[in-house]
Amino acid sequence: MSAKEVKFGVDARDRMLRGVDILANAVKVTLGPKGRNVVLDKSFGAPRITKDGVTVAKDIELEDKFENMGAQMVREVASKSADAAGDGTTTATVLAAAIVREGAKAVAAGMNPMDLKRGIDLAVEAVVADLVKNSKKVTSNEEIAQVGTISANGDAEIGKFLSDAMKKVGNEGVITVEEAKSLETELDVVEGMQFDRGYISPYFVTNADKMRVEFDDAYILINEKKLSNLNELLPLLEAVVQTGKPLVIVAEDVEGEALATLVVNRLRGGLKVAAVKAPGFGDRRKAMLQDIAILTGGQAISEDLGIKMENVTLAMLGKAKKVMIDKENTTIVNGAGKKADIEARVAQIKAQIEETTSDYDREKLQERLAKLAGGVAVIRVGGATEVEVKERKDRVDDAMHATRAAVEEGIVPGGGVALLRASEQLKGLKTKNDDQKTGVEIVRKALSWPARQIAINAGEDGSVIVGKILEKDQYNYGFDSQSGEYGNLVSKGIIDPTKVVRTAIQNAASVAALLITTEAMIAELPKKGNSGGGMPPGGGMGGMDF
């Protein structure tokens, strides 16, 4: 085990504080509509330019082990805020640095760190209660667009794309962000349920130009097993032919004489049919087939349930207004499932998302939820260069998470004003002793920093701006640093999702309180480099003359 270096008390906190400040100073310049860019060096390829706080924080690694520990703890604040709300990472970093800075002074002055922590916790509870009380529900598309615009650093186009996407796929729908191959940013919406399996044979194609199968008013057979025996299928095929409607078969696989017969019938025009492999694997496949069954009002045919293929009737098949199948994907639009059944399934999947501990499972469950609940929207971000596209994609990602958070918990005025107003509520907060009171005061001072920093980044005097905002009692009154004017921020469209502001202060205070109560730090000593000994003389190949 290698030797360790140990630092105590003031010495430990000073080194840690230096690391916190280095990281916070790099991140805070990105805050607000007039925040600056940060350029990150990459080991290969062009440098990356970003205005995303968490991206900057994740790129910082300091040489001094103790400084680095402080920086990494604050980086954790940014990461946690990004995970929980998808935005507010810079605000959280600024708050954490301010609380640590003031807290370290109080500890140095001889106050009890544990009481300071209790005071900080009391203050945060009061702030969260105030935010929730003043939060306003998001109802219109316009408000969703405003949230997206603010989070994308004032890019109204991104805000509009996001509100359009949410309008089309619903609040539960999946919105994914990809890099486009062109200059333009575009929105592509897939309505209904789509899964990543295409037709088994190209002979099923009905639209030769687009190389895809297009059926209207189709029956859908959902089967868990392989289909290779024709005799099993015959009774059902005859029943479907008499209705004159097309049939889509979703099964583990269709092969042998069953596939050959389907293809021949399709080519002769006797039966409109197409076969698709079932999506997913193992238990996930069972669940996805059940989703398709519920969406289309059919039954998943499984031997576990004691249903044999030859006994399947038309009533067991799903139905959909439109089915499109290309080489890679199958899309089912307007399934005939009952609304109540679909809602029950959605609630069940939501409960599973809450319970699961695996990120991979959570992601897959969310995909299933979106497919059932509305659809999938893809925003393809364009730009002139790769660097520009990456920078813009960062902002679209932030904005997407912010709009979701706004729909979830509502909105408060932006520009750091909600936290400023909450700081006023801390003035009369009751505490058990003076040290706890100082803890509350530390949070109260820190809450002015986001508004102050936004003003500083816009070239204004932070203290003057904060003073002027607090002179007025109106909750929504604040400073618009984009235009340099004061006014009602909500009516100007300068708003923050409550969830983003709430997670920022909770995460910042949680990590900052841990840093304040730190009394010792332990790090590995750097290894002393041994100077490598000379190489032994090489044995030449004897007796060889050149």
Curated annotation (Swiss-Prot):
> Which residues does the annotation say bind ATP?
30-33, 51, 87-91, 415, 496
> What are the UniProt keywords, alphabetically?
ATP-binding, Chaperone, Cytoplasm, Isomerase, Nucleotide-binding
Transmembrane stretches in the record are none
Q: Give a Pfam family name.
A: Cpn60_TCP1
Name the residue ranges with Gly residues bias.
530-546
- What PROSITE patterns does the entry give? CHAPERONINS_CPN60 (PS00296)
Its top-level enzyme class, in one word, is isomerase
Q: Name the major location.
A: cytoplasm
Q: Which GO terms describe its molecular function?
A: ATP binding; ATP-dependent protein folding chaperone; isomerase activity; unfolded protein binding
What's the Enzyme Commission number for this chain? 5.6.1.7
> Superkingdom of this entry's organism?
Bacteria
Which Gene3D superfamilies does the record cross-reference, listed alphabetically?
A: GroEL (3.50.7.10), GroEL-like equatorial domain (1.10.560.10), TCP-1-like chaperonin intermediate domain (3.30.260.10)
Q: Which InterPro entries match?
A: Chaperonin_Cpn60_CS (IPR018370), Cpn60/GroEL (IPR001844), Cpn60/GroEL/TCP-1 (IPR002423), GroEL-like_apical_dom_sf (IPR027409), GROEL-like_equatorial_sf (IPR027413), TCP-1-like_intermed_sf (IPR027410)
Catalysed reaction equations from the record: ATP + H2O + a folded polypeptide = ADP + phosphate + an unfolded polypeptide
Q: Does the keyword Cytoplasm apply?
A: yes
Query: Where are the residues of the annotated region Disordered?
Result: 527-546
Localisation per UniProt entry: Cytoplasm
Would I find Nucleotide-binding among this entry's keywords?
yes
**What Gene Ontology cellular-component terms does the record carry?**
cytoplasm
GO biological process, alphabetically ordered: protein refolding
User: Which NCBIfam families is this protein grouped with?
Assistant: GroEL (TIGR02348), PRK00013.1 (NF000592), PRK12849.1 (NF009487), PRK12850.1 (NF009488), PRK12851.1 (NF009489), PRK14104.1 (NF010704)
Assembly, in brief, is:
Forms a cylinder of 14 subunits composed of two heptameric rings stacked back-to-back. Interacts with the co-chaperonin GroES.
What's its job? Answer: Together with its co-chaperonin GroES, plays an essential role in assisting protein folding. The GroEL-GroES system forms a nano-cage that allows encapsulation of the non-native substrate proteins and provides a physical environment optimized to promote and accelerate protein folding.
Stated family: Belongs to the chaperonin (HSP60) family.
What is this protein's name? Chaperonin GroEL 2
What's the source species for this entry?
Rhodopseudomonas palustris (strain BisA53)
